């Protein structure tokens, strides 16, 4: 599996690369931190590991650029003890977040969980779902409503798929977290909240503001 490791600390880059390669990850680095996108497009990685603090442009900037062209999963690394970094990364479309210093085994567990849910997760063979007056194309991570189309991240689409398949029923937070992150012991409860809020903002763009209801203390429900 190809990994793009966007990390300017060469000591950490070398240590991480050696550890990840023992787990059959093929690690690619950045030659020019002024042009991360060229390397991203040439490698076409399965997952991006993105440091927050980088030369010239930070990891948030490059995440925005990547999200303009791709839904490739992104895991953030940060040495800053700032909860807003985690919130910002999730709002930009990151899939997970690890604060430095970290246990390498935790990082590997997160990478493996991301790979399973993004590339192997499927509730059944049907790839198109009808919901209210919209069509979910699961293969393209898109929603079509009348003449409007929006695109979701892999995480957002999995959440919505699970909710839509249980329309008018509560899907618990624990059920969603377990399906999305197999290593849920390492996941902040806020991570799911941020992803659901981001999904709601996108649905609002196609006039589906109240399509997902929060059931306080329980979970979420998609109205049919």
Curated annotation (Swiss-Prot):
Q: Which residues bind DNA?
A: 126-224
Outline the extent of the Response regulatory domain. Answer: 2-115
Q: Which Pfam families match?
A: Response_reg, Trans_reg_C
Give residue numbers for the modification (4-aspartylphosphate).
51
Which keywords does UniProt give here? Activator, Antibiotic resistance, Cytoplasm, DNA-binding, Phosphoprotein, Repressor, Transcription, Transcription regulation, Two-component regulatory system, Virulence
According to the lineage, what is the superkingdom?
Answer: Bacteria
Phosphoprotein recorded as keyword? yes
- What Gene Ontology molecular function terms does this protein carry? phosphorelay response regulator activity; transcription cis-regulatory region binding
Which cysteines does the record link by disulfide bonds?
none
InterPro entries per UniProt: CheY-like_superfamily, OmpR/PhoB-type_DNA-bd, Sig_transdc_resp-reg_C-effctor, Sig_transdc_resp-reg_receiver, WalR-like, WH-like_DNA-bd_sf
Q: Name one GO cellular component term.
A: cytosol
Keyword set includes Repressor: yes
Q: What is its main location?
A: cytoplasm
**What Gene3D superfamilies does the record tag this protein with?**
3.40.50.2300, Winged helix-like DNA-binding domain superfamily/Winged helix DNA-binding domain
Where is this protein localized, as stated in its record?
Cytoplasm
Q: How is it modified after translation?
A: Phosphorylated by GraS.
Biological process (GO) annotations held by this record are: regulation of DNA-templated transcription; response to antibiotic
Role noted for this protein: Member of the two-component regulatory system GraR/GraS involved in resistance against cationic antimicrobial peptides (CAMPs).
* Official protein name in the record: Response regulator protein GraR
